[in-house]
């Protein structure tokens, strides 16, 4: 797919056939967009309160998500009735189906019993377009309310033991409702059902791919930035900032300026790795700033994790602004844009009907730079999920080991050194972390683990080395498995592996007397210790 600059609109939803997901606050809403994209149909999520008249594009179809409310409650959210004037297919899921019935004036009420968990779907009308090729199978229920009457113009196409209206359809209007959640993996044929809706009923083209995205996004960036404006962006050595920087390089060449700030609390050999990958390997215009002493000086005596985060965030902005001011654009141009590696989950959280979630920890980003430097924001990855960013990185030639690198927090090792952050403490955490990651890679486990690291605890423990009593510090190892980082399970290593890692750390890292392994899931714990 080749994209002409003049023909490319700013919104991705104007480039690709798009299914609009209207979110009523379900914990599963984001999974609907993920499932649709898995079979190459572009989907975008907006809050259920979205005014259809304000859309600048027309969706190929609309999905109403589930939600934790009762449609008959006084404060229940309701969809803009103009969705029915678009003449596009509509699918209501759980609360979404009840919303369709409620709009049609038919009974929705509290069920005799709530239905949470697996249920058996009985397909009553296999000729229904939505259920084409879908057999009697397990589905996932999560509801307390249910339909008590069939809306006018609809017929029953599926049932379950507790839901006589488990699936309803108005074939002439292409409007469908299902009481279960096809977006979760527990619904065995859920993906098939969603594909029936998006591809067969809505006739959406299956042209959403990273190959096509590259062409259209590069053209979009060129159109947005223009022929002379320049862009700056912070890079960290992580996958998001590297992929973002690479696509900017492909779009505008050396008019993109990447700034890497070494804050003194990075991973082992991080700065050298960033130079080698971005500057030498990917040809990105890179400025490296050694500000470790400044950051560590400002962190002196600070033990509170929130204060650490804020000090690092504010110091980063200060250093970044100073370095950006030194960049001298070519004649006739000026720096107008700031690159930020926003991903689609960040967008979803900000636009969800439920609103942004409660802040558990302050997130380290460059948002403050926009106001201070009077820059416009450019976010080339804002439509992508993490797995899509990784695929994009591979297509752009970003090295595989970087594309699949584990996440690293913005405040770096400062929040993995519990207590005061000093050069000596950082060195201990850094060396222990490097050994842990090295052994994980040797064991072929790195891609199976979502994130792994070593944290230095603010306690000391008695030990024996040689014939001498020691009283030194404790390292806690953490490794987790997760799909979305909203919940996570601890990774189960073989005992021999942990024994080897612990032995290496105690023997090779000065100042460590004991190694522990964190077996706490999220929740109740967070991934990081601070």
From Swiss-Prot:
Broad enzyme group: ligase
Residues annotated as domain Glutamine amidotransferase type-1: 18-207
One term of GO molecular function: GMP synthase (glutamine-hydrolyzing) activity
Catalytic activity: XMP + L-glutamine + ATP + H2O = GMP + L-glutamate + AMP + diphosphate + 2 H(+)
GO biological process: GMP biosynthetic process; GMP metabolic process
Superkingdom of origin organism: Eukaryota
Pathways involved: Purine metabolism; GMP biosynthesis; GMP from XMP (L-Gln route): step 1/1
Residue ranges constituting the GMPS ATP-PPase domain according to the UniProt record: 208-405
Protein EC: 6.3.5.2
Active site: 94, 181, 183
Amino acids binding XMP: 309, 467, 522, 528
Matches recorded under InterPro entries: Class_I_gatase-like, GATASE, GMP_synth_C, GMP_synth_GATase, GMP_synthase, GMPS_ATP_PPase_dom, NAD/GMP_synthase, Rossmann-like_a/b/a_fold
GO cellular component assignments: cytosol
Keywords in alphabetical order: ATP-binding, Cytoplasm, Glutamine amidotransferase, GMP biosynthesis, Ligase, Magnesium, Nucleotide-binding, Purine biosynthesis
Subcellular location as annotated: Cytoplasm, Cytosol
Binding residues for ATP: 236-242
Cofactor(s) the protein requires to work: Mg(2+)
Function: Catalyzes the conversion of xanthine monophosphate (XMP) to GMP in the presence of glutamine and ATP through an adenyl-XMP intermediate.
Assembly information from the UniProt record: Homodimer.
PANTHER family: GMP SYNTHASE [GLUTAMINE-HYDROLYZING] (PTHR11922:SF2), GMP SYNTHASE-RELATED (PTHR11922)
Protein name: GMP synthase [glutamine-hydrolyzing]
Species in which this protein is naturally found: Candida albicans (strain SC5314 / ATCC MYA-2876)
Gene name of the record: GUA1
């Amino acid at each position: 797919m080749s994209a002409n600059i003049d023909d490319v609109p700013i919104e991705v939803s104007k480039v690709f056939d798009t299914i609009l997901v209207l979110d009523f606050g379900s914990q599963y809403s984001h999974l609907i967009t993920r499932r649709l994209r898995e079979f190459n149909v572009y989907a975008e999520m907006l809050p259920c309160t979205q005014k259809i008249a304000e859309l600048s594009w027309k969706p190929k179809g609309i999905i109403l998500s589930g939600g934790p409310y009762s449609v008959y409650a006084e404060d229940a959210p309701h969809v803009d009735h103009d969705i029915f004037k678009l003449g596009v297919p509509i699918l209501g899921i759980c609360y979404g189906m009840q919303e369709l019935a409620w709009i049609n004036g038919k009974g929705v009420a509290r069920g005799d019993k709530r239905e949470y968990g697996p249920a058996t779907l009985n397909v009553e009308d296999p000729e229904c377009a939505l259920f084409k090729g879908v057999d009697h199978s397990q589905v996932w229920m999560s509801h307390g309310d249910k339909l008590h009457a069939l809306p006018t113009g609809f017929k029953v196409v599926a049932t379950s033991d507790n839901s006589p209206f488990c699936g309803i359809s108005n074939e002439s209007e292409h409007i469908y409702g299902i009481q279960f959640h096809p977006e979760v993996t527990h619904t065995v044929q859920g993906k098939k059902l969603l594909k029936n809706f998006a591809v067969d009923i809505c006739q959406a083209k299956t042209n959403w791919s990273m190959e096509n995205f590259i062409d259209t996004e590069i053209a979009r960036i060129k159109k947005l930035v223009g022929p002379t404006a320049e862009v700056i962006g912070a890079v960290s050595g992580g996958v998001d900032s590297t992929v973002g920087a690479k696509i900017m390089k492909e779009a505008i060449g050396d008019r993109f300026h990447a700034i890497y700030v070494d804050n003194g609390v990075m991973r082992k050999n991080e700065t050298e790795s960033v130079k080698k990958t971005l500057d030498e390997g990917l040809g990105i215009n890179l400025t490296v700033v050694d500000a470790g002493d400044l950051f560590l000086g400002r962190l002196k005596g600070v033990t509170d994790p929130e204060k650490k985060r804020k000090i690092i965030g504010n110091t980063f902005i200060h250093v970044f602004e100073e370095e950006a001011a030194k960049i001298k654009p070519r004649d006739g141009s000026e720096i107008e844009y700031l690159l930020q590696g926003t991903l689609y989950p960040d967008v979803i959280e900000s636009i969800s009907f439920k609103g942004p979630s409660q802040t558990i920890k302050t997130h380290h980003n460059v948002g403050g730079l926009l106001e201070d430097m009077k820059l416009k924001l450019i976010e080339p990855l804002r439509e992508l999920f993490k797995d899509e960013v990784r695929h994009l990185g591979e297509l752009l030639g970003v090295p595989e080991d970087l594309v699949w690198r584990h996440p690293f927090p913005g405040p770096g090792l400062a929040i993995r050194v519990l207590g005061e952050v000093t050069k000596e403490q950082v060195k201990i955490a850094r060396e222990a972390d490097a050994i842990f990651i090295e052994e994980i890679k040797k064991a072929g486990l790195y891609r199976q683990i979502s994130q792994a690291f070593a944290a230095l605890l603010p306690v000391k423990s008695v030990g024996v080395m040689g014939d001498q009593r020691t009283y030194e510090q404790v390292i806690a190892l953490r490794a987790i498995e997760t799909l979305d980082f909203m919940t996570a399970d601890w990774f189960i290593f073989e005992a021999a592996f942990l024994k080897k890692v612990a032995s290496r750390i105690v023997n090779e890292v000065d100042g460590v007397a004991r190694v522990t392994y964190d077996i706490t899931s999220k929740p109740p714990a967070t991934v990081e210790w601070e």
